[in-house]
C-alpha cells in the first residue's frame, strides 16, 4: 500500500527534520520519497526498508505492532510519499493553494513504478488522512484525486480514491 502525505513546510525543512536524530520510536519520521513543487523526486528511504510516515494507523483494518509500548501502524507494510506543501500551507488550516502540475506528473510516475514493481492494486493508494486512527492528520490537504487518476489512467494504471 501507499500512503500520500504533505510536508507542511518546505522541502528543505522536511529534509532537515529527517537529518535530525530521533532515537525514540515514537519520534521517528521519514518518507520513502519526497516530491518538490518543481516536480523534483527525492528518494530518501529504500522502498524495501521501513519508513516512519504514519503513527497510529490502519488500512482496511490491517496494522502491525513492532513496539509493544506503541499503538499499531501501517509503517511495516506501507510506502510513504510526501508532496512539498506550497507556501500558503505553512499553517494549521484545512487547505492551501494546492499542488503543482509538476507534482501531480511526478507523483503519477512514481506511483506507476511502484504499482508495477510491487504489484500493488491501485486501490491500495490512500492518504494519511484515511489511515490515521488518532484523527489528528488531514494530509495531504487540498489534494485533488481526480488529477492523479487522470495521470495514472494515461499511464495505464487506475487509482480508486
What name fits each language-model region?
Residues 1-72:
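N-terminal catalytic cores of peptidoglycan-degrading enzymes
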Residues 76-80, 84-161:
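Basic/polar, cationic surfaces and motifs that engage anionic cell-wall
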Amino acid at each position: 500500500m501507499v500512503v500520500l502525505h504533505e510536508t507542511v513546510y518546505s522541502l528543505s525543512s522536511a529534509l532537515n527534520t529527517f537529518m535530525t536524530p530521533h532515537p525514540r520510536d515514537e519520534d521517528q519520521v521519514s518518507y520513502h520519497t519526497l516530491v518538490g513543487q518543481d516536480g523534483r523526486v527525492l528518494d530518501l528511504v529504500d522502498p524495501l526498508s521501513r519508513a516512519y510516515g504514519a503513527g497510529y494507523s490502519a488500512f482496511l483494518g490491517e496494522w502491525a505492532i513492532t513496539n509493544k509500548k506503541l499503538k499499531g501502524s501501517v509503517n511495516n507494510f506501507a510506502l510513504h510519499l510526501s508532496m512539498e506543501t506550497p507556501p500558503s500551507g505553512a499553517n494549521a488550516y484545512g487547505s492551501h493553494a494546492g499542488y503543482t502540475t509538476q507534482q501531480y506528473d511526478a507523483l503519477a510516475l512514481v506511483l506507476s513504478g511502484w504499482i508495477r514493481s510491487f504489484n500493488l492494486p491501485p486501490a491500495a493508494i490512500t492518504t494519511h488522512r484515511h489511515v490515521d486512527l488518532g484523527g489528528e492528520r488531514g494530509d495531504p490537504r487540498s489534494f485533488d484525486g481526480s488529477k492523479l487518476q487522470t495521470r495514472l489512467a494515461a499511464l495505464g494504471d487506475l487509482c480508486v480514491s
